[in-house]
């Protein structure tokens, strides 16, 4: 249990302190549930106010990707969400992509926070990837 907590908190601290490229995984039923699960894991190993934990999570986690297993056994991206904002007790997220069983992964909204992509010189690549996806040419 301690390893899970330590690993989770260290990943969160890495993201919060400006280390680019942090990546972690967590078991949850949706993107929104992943945020609550992360809060719970941190609370299990540390006596810290929930609001402080939520603030750190909101400022260090940018994108959430929910993978799931379909009825045929294939794993698919079911949802990609972005943390748009945080207000004292609630994360404001919006769904960028959502899986539809008849149409596959569909764009729902455009990325809100593009500053980091621009800072790291990746914004043009992101725009090109979205363009290809919309045209149905993305792999």
Q: What is the role of each PLM region?
A:
Residues 73-139:
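NTP-binding/hydrolysis catalytic cores, primarily Walker-type P-loop NTPases
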Residues 1-88:
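Conserved P-loop NTPase nucleotide-binding/switch module
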């Amino acid at each position: 249990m301690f390893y899970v907590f330590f690993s989770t908190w260290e990943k969160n601290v890495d993201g919060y302190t400006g280390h680019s490229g942090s990546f972690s995984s967590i078991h949850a039923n949706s993107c929104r549930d992943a945020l609550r699960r992360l809060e719970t894991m941190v609370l299990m190993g540390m006596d810290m106010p929930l609001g402080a934990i939520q603030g750190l999570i909101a400022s260090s986690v940018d994108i959430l990707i929910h993978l799931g297993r379909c009825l045929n056994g294939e794993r698919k991206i079911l949802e990609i969400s972005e943390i748009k904002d945080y207000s004292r007790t609630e994360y404001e997220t919006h769904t960028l992509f959502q899986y539809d069983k008849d149409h596959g992964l569909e764009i729902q909204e455009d990325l809100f926070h593009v500053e980091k992509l621009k800072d790291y010189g990746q914004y043009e690549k992101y725009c090109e990837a979205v363009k290809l996806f919309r045209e149905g040419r993305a792999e």
